[in-house]
A protein has these predicted regions:
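Sec-dependent signal peptide cleavage junction
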Residues: 22-30
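Bacterial N-terminal signal peptides that target proteins for export
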Residues: 1-10
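C-terminal PAP-associated
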Residues: 29-565
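Bacterial N-terminal signal peptides
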Residues: 10-22
Length: 565
């Protein structure tokens, strides 16, 4: 989600358009970050407020129209800019669907204090819904914080990392997010809202929250939710816990934990550990260690639970990262109550220092995704998709790095014990200039495998302009290359062993260097897709549209949707 001091908004003056506005921080007592080095706080995925100054071939097949999901955006002082980090859940009829995203409008007013309207926003996690298969969308804002009074006694304000799922009943949507107390900014851990359609309207009915038993000594981040497709009572949430080490609050490098419900979300049980803190982190009390982040859960056909996540890079005590990382998985045979020993899926070259040049944050998450085939010739096959840099890179995150990255897939036919060698889902990439990343793997009812991903062509702009991006900490990434990004999909009919030619989903290319936003990261940390029947539904961040800011057309980052039949 947005970056650096988590949900801290630096105590510096931040310019919104031409207005100087104080960006507030959560207090040290509430966040526990006072003694944590800045480079280490940036391991977390939290959204931060951002200046809205300038940021600088395939047959379309059966791709449906590209539709903007969110309402038109307005610049300060009427609003704040930026809608990204997308997620989607779709009902069995393929017509009723809910999308979610990080929404910069949530920085207005309490608890963040940005000067804009309205002064009482609902949250940093927006949502929209459609009742006609995505032809039209209604922007719902964010879930009403006052829903929290009825279930947890406080107003629950979502603060990003949105993740949607739909229950096995095909009617109840679950929306997981990080959360804080609306009035005080106190950390609440994770929230899960439940909602449903009634006619042509959608509403959230209630919310539950859960947090580390050790309270502010630990910090929850990057949650993701999955539901059991065969039992509406069961769902799990995996997350990263930056836990206390050696008496130092929130000083760990990430432990992967899981919470579960067996009553449809009325109560949540946990946490249990799927990926223990890495031994080097524990041995050095978190002064140096190996990052664990970006977990995603999924249910198998027999009720088993799999969780995948990124392990690495390893950081020195001064914050210098290694170039290597790996993808791991853990399995539970009792619905998420306990997990076996984690298993390595594959080694990777971390993308941390190899982001698209138009990305407005100094570091980049690898973020693997997971699915399980529950039909077809390969029923029970577990699939994990992930990106990897073409070659290891340790270049400075302030420099433009044009080394290519690719999307790979591995699969397991023995419940995650052993894994196939990773192979590209969309062919090879050159050594420089093409970045494929943030894949989402989904499966169809007939057993096909679908992978949606971003592809960025890192090249000079036709007008010869530089890409000039603020990346936090007073730093900029400046250079001649731009990030020209499209959303694509590949499909496999043999269980992920081979894929057809890529299909371009986005009907217009986004220049990530041109998006004008009030959030960091400008395009989020992941994208969303779901497959129902044989149709894949995708939502992504897109900067094709412009609005007038002080009389000048400026690109803004919206959420776009399309289906692929």
């Amino acid at each position: 989600m947005f970056t650096t001091l988590r949900f801290a908004l630096v105590t510096a003056l931040v310019l919104i358009g031409f207005l100087a506005v104080p960006a507030l921080t959560q207090t040290a007592a509430a966040s526990g970050t006072a003694s944590i080095p800045t480079w280490k706080q940036e391991l977390r995925g939290a959204l931060t407020f951002e200046d809205a100054s300038a940021q600088g071939g395939q047959d379309s097949g059966s791709v449906g129209p590209n539709v903007r999901v969110n309402a038109p955006q307005r610049p300060s002082p009427a609003g704040l800019l930026g809608r990204s980090e997308t997620t989607i859940a779709v009902a069995p009829d393929g017509r009723h669907m809910v999308a979610g995203w990080n929404d910069a409008q949530g920085f207005c007013g309490v608890p963040f204090g940005a000067a804009c309207k309205p002064q009482v926003p609902n949250g940093l996690s927006g949502y929209g819904f459609s009742v006609d298969g995505g032809s039209t969308w209604k922007d719902g804002g964010a879930p009403d914080p006052s829903l929290g009074f009825g279930s947890v006694g406080v107003p629950v304000f979502t603060r990003g990392d949105p993740w949607l799922a739909i229950d096995a009943d095909g009617q109840t949507f679950l929306y997981a997010n990080l959360a804080v107390h609306r009035d005080t900014g106190a950390d609440l851990g994770v929230s899960v809202h439940r909602g449903s359609f009634a006619g042509n309207k959608f509403a959230w009915h209630d919310v539950r929250v859960f947090n580390s038993p050790r309270g502010a000594n630990d910090f929850y981040d990057k949650e993701a939710i999955a539901t059991d497709p065969n039992d509406a009572h069961n769902a799990v949430v995996s997350l990263t816990n930056f836990q206390e080490l050696c008496g130092m609050p929130q000083f760990g490098f990430g432990q992967i934990e899981v919470w579960r419900t067996v009553d449809g979300g009325d109560t949540w049980l946990g946490p249990v550990i799927a990926g223990p803190e890495q031994p080097d982190s524990v041995a050095d009390c978190g002064n140096s260690g190996t990052l664990q982040q970006s977990s995603v859960p999924v249910f198998g056909p027999s009720g088993e639970v799999f969780v995948t996540w990124q392990v690495g890079p390893t950081f020195s005590a001064s914050g210098v990262p290694s170039t290597n990382a790996a993808i791991f998985i853990a399995r539970s045979l009792d619905g998420g109550a306990t997990f076996g020993t984690p298993v390595k899926v594959a080694d990777t070259n971390s993308l941390r220092q190899d982001s698209p040049v138009g990305y407005n944050r100094a570091r980049f998450n690898d973020h693997p995704r997971i699915a399980v085939l529950d039909n077809g010739d390969h029923q029970g096959r577990v699939l994990v998709a992930f990106p990897s840099a073409k070659t290891a890179t340790s270049s400075s995150s302030t420099a433009q790095n044009l080394k290519s990255t690719n999307v790979l897939l591995s699969f397991s036919d023995d419940g995650g014990a052993t894994w196939s060698a990773p192979h590209p889902v969309a062919g090879s990439v050159p050594s420089m200039g093409v970045k494929r990343f943030w894949p989402v793997v989904t499966v169809s009812s007939a057993g096909s495998v679908n992978v949606v991903y971003y592809e960025s062509q890192e090249k000079s702009a036709p007008d010869g302009s530089n890409c000039n991006i603020t990346i936090g900490g007073g730093l900029r990434r400046i250079g001649p290359a731009h990030s020209f990004v499209d959303t694509k999909i590949v499909r496999s009919s043999d269980g992920g062993e081979s894929f057809g030619n890529p299909i371009k989903i986005s009907s217009a290319t986004s220049d990530w260097c041109a998006g004008t936003v009030n959030i960091r990261p400008n395009f989020g940390d992941y994208i969303g897709a779901a497959t129902v029947g044989e149709t894949t539904f995708a939502v992504w961040a897109d900067s094709r549209l412009t609005i007038l800011i002080n009389g000048v057309p400026r690109n803004v980052v919206d959420v776009f949707y399309a289906s692929v039949g």
